[in-house]
Amino acid sequence: MSVLSKNYTLNNGVEIPKLGLGTWFIDDADAADAVRAAVATGYRHIDTAQAYGNERGVGEGVRTCGVPREQLFVVSKVAAEHKTYESAAKSIDETLEKMGLDYLVMMIIHSPQPWGEVNQSENRYVEGLSLIHISEPHETDSYLV
């Protein structure tokens, strides 16, 4: 059995392919071809990020690869500068629009780095609630975190 057909099972029961196409350093103009070639080879896990600047091309590749969308595990990442729930949620909606997709299987916080005010805040409880909130599916079920 090829590693391309092997999966890990996440704690929530969702299966993620063990091997995925990482698209860092793939230009947006080349991303669709790269995704289509990877899917033709057997890849079913495609990874991009807002910071890579290639979500449009990756989405095009996903939409035009010839494999049904529900058979692909598509992941993107919220850019590190989005520090609030509102900003992160807006950026996820923008990602879906750029990619031309209705949903992503996983959205990751890319390189979560604290900011200078993190320990200065009087509102850490409320800020912490945003992490709990984004761990639930978005109210439109257009993406899952």
Which stretches of residues belong to each language-model region?
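A short, structured active-site edge motif that brings together acidic residues
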Residues: 70-82, 103-112
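Residue-level detector of conserved catalytic or cofactor/ligand-binding positions
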Residues: 132-145
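Feature marks short, surface-exposed loop/turn motifs that line or immediately flank catalytic pockets
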Residues: 25-27, 52, 82, 110-116
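N-terminal binding-site loop/beta-alpha segment at the start of enzyme catalytic domains
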Residues: 1-72, 89-90, 102
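Hydrophobic pocket-lining residues within nucleotide cofactor-binding pockets
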Residues: 26, 78, 137
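Catalytic beta/alpha-barrel core
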Residues: 48-50, 107-108, 142
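Glycine/small-residue-rich loop that forms an oxyanion/phosphate-binding "nest" at active or ligand-binding sites
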Residues: 85-99, 105-108, 113-128
